[in-house]
Amino acid sequence: MILDLSDDAKEFGRQALKAFEAAGGDQLLVQADAKPDTRAALVVPVLDSLGVFELEPRSDADSLEAAAAVCRSAGYWALPYPVAERLASPHDLDADGLVVVDPAAPEAALQGLDNRWATVTLDGVRSTVARLGATGPSFATALELSAVDDAGCDDVALALTLPCWTLLGMLDRAIDLTTAHVSLRKQFGQTLSSFQGVQFQLTDAEVERSGVDMLAKYTLWSVGTNPADEAINDALALRLAAIEAAEVVFRVCHQLHGAVGFCDETVLSWLSRYSQPLRRSPFGVSKTRDVLTSRLGRRGLTGLFSS
């Protein structure tokens, strides 16, 4: 097992990062926030130029790694478009993208988009989105569903995993922004980065981020290798680790930015706000933990260190 992306996948991610920056970078989100119905027009041409929608992550290992890399790059720039969900689309449904939902309260960050969307629950129950309901912050919207079948177990793991790569990209950016901030900002005649307490806080955040980085690579391998049930468990474990890490990383980054970190003039504010749908849907920390625990029972996760 090689727990790293291929050189080609990493290069694809780097090119995507540059393309998103050239297309407007942080301003893409600002513009989409003001006019959600422009999300596709702002982003899809860039994705088309990169050939993102030509990837086949469900059937090709190289495409799977490239898809993860581009999702991470999309997260870095908080790209106002559901790249991961588009790439997770199932082969056997007439849908442009796939979202994992909580059947009790299906929702997703799809405001302003007119694509054909499908949803799947952890039990493999698939539906199509009949219409978008009430909207909330950060493009979140309730979904009105039309049932299709219960044959979607093989679709779940990838649809859980790729959004975690998007969230990982957001954590990358939050750490980079905060490192730059404390290296520039001075207090008592010296930069904030020179204070030991600040160094400890940043180290705590980086440990969380790097842990998600490693687990995301393992889960990507699991999605492409293991049976559906094991892959779903690994994907849920990744999701739990990612949203727990996000709480630590964004808390530390906001603390070190101070009050300015909550102002729209700073990128961290936008990044933090638009990470919320990824962290809350389909489940937040508590329910993700409960679901994973109930699925595993006394068996534990299957992995490198299982007995």
Where are these regions (language model features)?
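Alpha-helical interface subdomain recognition
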Residues: 1-75, 161-307
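FAD-binding core of flavoproteins
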Residues: 76-176, 180, 299, 303-307
